[in-house]
Amino acid sequence: MSEIRLYVSTTESQAEQILDLLSEVFGEEDFAIGTTEVDEKRDIWEASVYMMAEDEAQVRSRVETALKSGFPDAQLLREVIPDVDWVVKSLEGLKPVRAGRFLVHGSHDRDKVRPGDIAIEIDAGQAFGTGHHGTTAGCLEVIDRVVRSRRVRNALDLGTGSGVLAIAVRKLKNIPVLATDIDPIATRVAAENVRRNGIASGIVTRTAPGFHSTAFSEHGPFDLIIANILARPLIRMAPQLAAHLAPAGSVILSGILAAQRWKVIAAYSGARLRHVRTIWRNGWVTIHFDRP
């Protein structure tokens, strides 16, 4: 079944306002929302909400009602996102990525693994996380540092995507890892990648929006929490995330643009965590916190 995008084309400032409105409307429901810059010179942005075709009618009704109250002139547009075999489309040309001691590679590059590499095999697919994005590579670097230098007995990978970060933790240290994602496709892909890397017994995958699952209380609190999502939900979830962190635990956050880092640091400092370091990669940052 195809995915549908409903969106409004507007200015940057109004797109952010509409995004806030959509966040209020859908809260923790399983509908992705976001803003995208279309034309920098003309200040054209799009505020979007994504859903499966079967949910379009009820989502459209709720969005139209919300827009009437705050943005009566806004025109709601529609795009059908076709099903694409992303493995075939995006695998070609991807090269192995090194981050810390990790080598993230596709099945076509198994011969690139060298002695001493911690190899993680991930083929490009519908779930985010092949190591090529600056956020994933930054997380891998910090994971390598944290797991080597601190006592880590269990870990949470929140918004696991392809499962690459959960796999990295498990390959570094023989500890249990809970890997969750709001998207059931991502959860399925992560589970497949865990099996592909031969560590299925050590990683539990669950579909869960935010922290709304009994899995967190069953497996936590966690010595290490990794969340590579986006700045806005990271800021919103700061109190909940800190509540699931064990004493003397560590937090690794990414999906954060460089310009957004201070808001994220402020939110987690307010949750009584200590900012340790920030890693920069291609305009994105990965931020490491500890619980004092």
From Swiss-Prot:
By its UniProt entry, which HAMAP family does this protein fall under? Methyltr_PrmA
Which NCBIfam families does the record match to this protein? PRK00517.2-1
Q: Which controlled-vocabulary keywords does the entry list?
A: Cytoplasm, Methyltransferase, S-adenosyl-L-methionine, Transferase
Q: Which family does it belong to?
A: Belongs to the methyltransferase superfamily. PrmA family.
**SUPFAM superfamilies named in the record:** S-adenosyl-L-methionine-dependent methyltransferases
- Enzyme class, top EC level, equals transferase
Q: What is the lineage of its organism?
A: Bacteria, Pseudomonadati, Pseudomonadota, Alphaproteobacteria, Hyphomicrobiales
Q: Which reaction does it catalyse?
A: L-lysyl-[protein] + 3 S-adenosyl-L-methionine = N(6),N(6),N(6)-trimethyl-L-lysyl-[protein] + 3 S-adenosyl-L-homocysteine + 3 H(+)
Q: Which PANTHER family match?
A: ELECTRON TRANSFER FLAVOPROTEIN BETA SUBUNIT LYSINE METHYLTRANSFERASE
According to UniProt, the name of this protein is Ribosomal protein L11 methyltransferase
What GO MF annotations does this protein's record show?
A: protein-lysine N-methyltransferase activity
Report the principal subcellular site: cytoplasm
Subcellular localization(s) per the UniProt record: Cytoplasm
Residue sites binding S-adenosyl-L-methionine per the record: T136, G159, D181, N228
The record's section on Pfam families has:
PrmA
Q: Which domain of life is it from?
A: Bacteria
Q: Name one GO cellular component term.
A: cytoplasm
Q: Which E.C. number(s) belong to this protein? A: 2.1.1.-
Gene Ontology biological process terms in this record: methylation
